[in-house]
């Protein structure tokens, strides 16, 4: 039993006055209330923290989901650009404006630059607007033409189709002239010189091209392209030296060696080839790509044994008493002359070919038909050179 009576919070000393006792009991009561309040606050804080954790988890989950969808959109774009863009727009990851799509392509994170090039080169109205917006994201002010081309050609991979290249280089030339008024008389001049620089880059840095152009030849080739007048020799010489000292960088997803040229061929397979000087049949692995026919001793070889440029050649079906399913490559304009081609000797030397015609035997009639069809498609008159010739004629007519 409590000495001197009980109360909230335990016993009360007997020697306290009545007033002191009441004050002590009041203090104890308030202490208990405070402890209860603290416990209630702790419980409420714990509840709030749980809610915050749940919200954070939901936000993180949303961010994770968004990142997953963006990654999926990029993959879809690399497989089919139109479907990829559509997926990103439908999932509110991209606005449907040409400017927003152009920004997405310009940043290029996780995107295949070959696919970017193909998409930008399409002739649909929307793609053309995207191309325009994409080019406007490039700042070419105070850059010489080679510097501007380096920047432009690093942001995507030029497609192989002449009409696509035409649209893209036209957009580039217009943008360059807008950023650098007074450098060229017209966008046609910029367009033609840009192509001359791209071809110069190939001629100087492709080891299969043995006849390397000099600065003088480059200057001569570009006479009269500035509305009938000549560009300053110093300008052309500086552009030449820039390309000679440093080739254009090719976007990494395509690489810069021959292996990548053969990565996506028009056709490939084993065929028999009749020798040019020694008339024996040799089994070779053929690859048709970029308007050239390459042949290798083995499928694993990185360097071809021979290269046959298909420009100016024709193809015909022939009968051969020793081999079935034969066709020939020949030059209809120069019958009897050796076809311009090259081959690699056993000691590694690159020499000119010895063929007046290339006679080839396929394993079956079906494969012969397929090869002939593919080669015919490849050796149709190259629209790229027609396109460039048209532009040069346009400049000449302005004289």
UniProtKB/Swiss-Prot annotation:
GO cellular component assignments: adherens junction; bicellular tight junction; cytoplasm; cytosol; nucleoplasm; plasma membrane; ruffle
Keyword Cell membrane: yes
Membrane topology of this protein: Peripheral membrane protein
Record PROSITE patterns: PH_DOMAIN, SEC7
Domain SEC7: 77-206
Function according to Swiss-Prot or TrEMBL: Promotes guanine-nucleotide exchange on ARF1. Promotes the activation of ARF factors through replacement of GDP with GTP. Plays a role in the epithelial polarization.
Subunit structure: Interacts with TAMALIN. Interacts with FRMD4A. Interacts with FRMD4B.
Protein name as catalogued: Cytohesin-3
Taxonomic lineage from the root: Eukaryota, Metazoa, Chordata, Craniata, Vertebrata
């Amino acid at each position: 039993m409590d000495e001197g009576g009980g109360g909230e919070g335990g016993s009360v000393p007997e020697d306290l006055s009545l007033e002191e006792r009441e004050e002590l009991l009041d203090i104890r009561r308030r202490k208990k209330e405070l402890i209860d309040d603290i416990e209630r606050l702790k419980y409420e804080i714990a509840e709030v923290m749980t809610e915050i954790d749940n919200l954070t988890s939901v936000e993180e989950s949303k961010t994770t989901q968004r990142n997953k969808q963006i990654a999926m959109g990029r993959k879809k774009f690399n497989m089919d650009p139109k479907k990829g863009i559509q997926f990103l727009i439908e999932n509110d990851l991209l606005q449907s404006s040409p400017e927003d799509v152009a920004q997405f392509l310009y940043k290029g994170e996780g995107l295949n630059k070959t696919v970017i090039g193909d998409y930008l080169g399409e002739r649909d109205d929307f793609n053309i607007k995207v191309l325009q917006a994409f080019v406007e994201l490039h700042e070419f002010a105070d850059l010489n033409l080679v510097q501007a081309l380096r920047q432009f050609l690093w942001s995507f991979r030029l497609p192989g189709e002449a009409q696509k290249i035409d649209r893209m280089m036209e957009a580039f030339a217009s943008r360059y002239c807008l950023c650098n008024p007074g450098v060229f008389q017209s966008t046609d001049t910029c367009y033609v010189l840009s192509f001359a620089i791209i071809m110069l880059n190939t001629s100087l840095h492709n080891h299969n091209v043995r006849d390397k152009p000099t600065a003088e030849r480059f200057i001569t080739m570009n006479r009269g392209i500035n509305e009938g007048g000549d560009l300053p020799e110093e300008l052309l010489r500086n552009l030449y030296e820039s390309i000679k000292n440093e080739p254009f960088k090719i976007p990494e997803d395509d690489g810069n060696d021959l292996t990548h040229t053969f990565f996506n061929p028009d056709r490939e397979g084993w065929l028999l080839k009749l020798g040019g000087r020694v008339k024996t049949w040799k089994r070779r692995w053929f690859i048709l790509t970029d308007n050239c026919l390459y042949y290798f001793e083995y499928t694993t070889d990185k360097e071809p044994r021979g290269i046959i440029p298909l420009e100016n050649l024709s193809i015909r079906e022939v009968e051969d008493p020793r081999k079935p399913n034969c066709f020939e490559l020949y030059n209809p304009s120069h019958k009897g002359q050796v076809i311009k081609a090259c081959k690699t000797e056993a000691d590694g030397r690159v020499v000119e070919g010895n063929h007046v015609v290339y006679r080839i035997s396929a394993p079956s009639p079906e494969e012969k038909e397929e090869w002939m069809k593919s080669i015919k498609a490849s050796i149709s008159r190259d629209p790229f050179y027609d396109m460039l010739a048209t532009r040069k004629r346009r400049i000449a007519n302005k004289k």
